[in-house]
Curated annotation (Swiss-Prot):
<dbReference type="GO" id="GO:0005829">
    <property type="term" value="C:cytosol"/>
</dbReference>
<dbReference type="GO" id="GO:0000028">
    <property type="term" value="P:ribosomal small subunit assembly"/>
</dbReference>
<dbReference type="InterPro" id="IPR036847">
    <property type="entry name" value="RimP_C_sf"/>
</dbReference>
<dbReference type="InterPro" id="IPR028998">
    <property type="entry name" value="RimP_C"/>
</dbReference>
<comment type="function">
    <text>Required for maturation of 30S ribosomal subunits.</text>
</comment>
<dbReference type="InterPro" id="IPR028989">
    <property type="entry name" value="RimP_N"/>
</dbReference>
<comment type="similarity">
    <text>Belongs to the RimP family.</text>
</comment>
<protein>
    <recommendedName>
        <fullName>Ribosome maturation factor RimP</fullName>
    </recommendedName>
</protein>
<dbReference type="Pfam" id="PF17384">
    <property type="entry name" value="DUF150_C"/>
</dbReference>
<keyword id="KW-0963">Cytoplasm</keyword>
<feature type="region of interest" description="Disordered">
    <location>
        <begin position="198"/>
        <end position="259"/>
    </location>
</feature>
<dbReference type="Pfam" id="PF02576">
    <property type="entry name" value="RimP_N"/>
</dbReference>
<dbReference type="GO" id="GO:0006412">
    <property type="term" value="P:translation"/>
</dbReference>
<dbReference type="InterPro" id="IPR003728">
    <property type="entry name" value="Ribosome_maturation_RimP"/>
</dbReference>
<dbReference type="InterPro" id="IPR035956">
    <property type="entry name" value="RimP_N_sf"/>
</dbReference>
<feature type="compositionally biased region" description="Basic and acidic residues">
    <location>
        <begin position="243"/>
        <end position="253"/>
    </location>
</feature>
<keyword id="KW-0690">Ribosome biogenesis</keyword>
Amino acid sequence: MTEPTPAVPETDDLAEPRLVIEPGVAARFCAVAEPVLMAMGYRLVRIKVSGDAGCTVQIMAERPDGTMLIDDCEAASRALSPVLDVADPIDRAYRLEISSPGIDRPLVRRSDFARYAGHLVKIEMAVPHQGRKRYRGLLDGVEGDAVRVQREGATKDEDPLVLLPMHDIGDARLVLTDELIAESMRRGKQAERDLKQSLGLAPEPPPHAKRSDPKKSHAPKRGPKAAKAPTKPKPQNTKQHRLAADKARRGEIDTSEGD
C-alpha cells in the first residue's frame, strides 16, 4: 500500500508550539510521539490516556492545514507502534488509537484560533478571567497573546467582547454547528483530492469529456455565415458604349442594332 504523502509544510507550521501540555503519562507519550509525527509531516494535537475498559491511548494528529485522512491515521499508527513499544512509556498493556481532531476539535495552537474565527467556541480557563472560568461565544480571532470572543449571554451593561489570555486557557473546543460541518467536509474533500493528485491516483475524465485546448480561443463560436446576396455586375464603360450614349442623346439610332 502506498503511504500518503502530505504536502511539504513550512517548518514553522510543524514546529508551532501547543498552548496546552498534558501531564503525567500523557506527557511521556507526547515526548515519544511528537518527533515521529513531525518527521512524517503531521502535527500532534492532543494525547488522552483513558482507563475505561482497559487502557486506551488516543493520539490526535493533523496535517498543518487541519485535515487528517484515514490513510494518514493508518500510516501514523504503523510508524508510532514500534517506537512506542521500544520506549515503553507505560507499565501496562494499552490500546493505541490514532485519530483526527474531529469536527468539534480542540484548539491547541495560536493558528487554530485564527483559522476558525467566525465559528462558535467554548473555552474553559485554567486561571479565571474576570471572575469566570467558562466562556462560550463566537470566536473573533486573536489579538496579541489573547483570544477574542464575542461572549453569549452578555447583559446590556456588559461588553460582549472579551480578550482571554492564551496562556491561561485550560481547554478550548469548537461547538458543532451546520456551518462548521460544511466547512469540515469541504476541507476533507479538498485534502482527499490533493492526496490522490500527489499519488498519481486522480481519476481520468470520462470518455465523453473533452479536454480544453489552451491554444484555442474560448470565445463563443459564431453561427453559420449568411449567404451573400447576388451582386450586380459592375457597369462597363468601353468606347462603344460611350458612342452609343452620344447617339442616344442626339436622338440618332444605330441601324446596325436591333432586328
